[in-house]
Design a protein with these regions (language model features):
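Short secondary-structure junctions
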Residues: 2-11, 60-64
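Catalytic metal-binding acidic patch
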Residues: 13-54, 58, 67-75
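Short, solvent-exposed loop/turn segments at secondary-structure junctions
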Residues: 20-21, 77-78, 174-177
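Conserved NTP/Mg2+-binding pocket subregion across the NTase superfamily
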Residues: 50-162, 169
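Non-transmembrane, amphipathic alpha-helical segments
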Residues: 136, 160, 164, 220-223, ...
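Extended, basic/helix-rich recognition subdomains
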Residues: 145, 149-208
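Structured mid-to-C-terminal alpha-helical surface segments
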Residues: 183-244
């Protein structure tokens, strides 16, 4: 499907994320990074996103497909590296309703590409073209840190994580790990690492989030309103101290 829509400009396809590093968990996405030699126009972008809905299922849906997350970048926008870099297209299940209603996100400058490309360079499989470590330049530590800081800035009040508590808690664990080590770890690995560094009052929440992610316990973080808010505040403050 990707080749059918982008064949004329397709440079590389890299599989990364849980499928390569740590193994797929019950709700894990299939993460793909696609590089093209020229930015797709609006009609091509929209046609591809509509088709991708056919090979992706919402998390926990029990459908034939796993959730798909696909990012498309133009080679000239990321090689040589610059920050923030431009993202041509992003597809994910959180966009399904918008896509079906005819709302398509345009190309944007994306701070998160600094994290994504670092992740792909560390752990990925080239499905087309050279390895990510060969194709992409290293992201400078300064830009990686800025992207981490930019990411945590979005979580300030309960409304920012309501309905997505587990993912936000685990994302903060990964960011804490990355800010401290410069590396990117699977969610469960980062959560275990963080749990060893947390005050006792925050450990039950991170352990619960990790167990729910692994599928060994039910996800009840939505019921743990105060615990979640306290963890977010503590984790953010710790990460900010590390990054400054």
């Amino acid at each position: 499907m990707i080749e059918r829509h982008l064949a004329a400009t397709l440079d590389t396809i890299h599989l990364f994320g849980s499928a390569i590093d740590g193994g797929l968990k019950p709700d894990s996405d299939i993460d793909l990074l696609v590089t093209v030699s020229a930015a797709p126009n609006d009609s091509l972008r929209q046609a591809l996103m509509l088709d991708l809905l056919k090979v992706s299922s919402p998390p926990g849906d029990g459908g034939t497909w796993r959730p798909l997350e696909l990012t498309v970048v133009a080679r000239s926008e990321v090689v040589p590296w610059r920050y923030p870099a431009r993202r041509e297209l992003q597809f994910g299940e959180w966009l399904r309703h918008d896509i079906l209603s005819g709302t398509f996100e345009p190309a944007v400058l994306d701070h998160d590409l600094a994290i994504l490309l670092t992740k792909a360079r560390q752990h990925s499989l080239a499905l087309l073209g050279p390895s990510a470590a060969t194709f992409f330049e290293p992201v400078p530590k300064e830009h990686f840190s800025k992207a981490l800081f930019y990411t945590i800035a979005q979580w300030n009040a309960e409304s920012d994580w309501k309905g997505d508590e587990r993912n936000v808690v685990l994302a903060l664990a990964r960011i804490w790990y990355s800010a401290s080590t410069g590396l990117i770890a699977p969610k469960d690995v980062a959560a275990a690492w963080v749990s060893e560094r947390l005050p006792a009052e925050h450990r039950p929440l991170i352990c619960k989030a990790r167990a729910a992610y692994l599928g060994s316990e039910d996800d009840d973080l939505a019921m743990r309103v105060e615990e979640t808010a306290a963890f977010v505040r503590y984790a953010k403050a710790t990460i900010e101290r590390i990054l400054r």
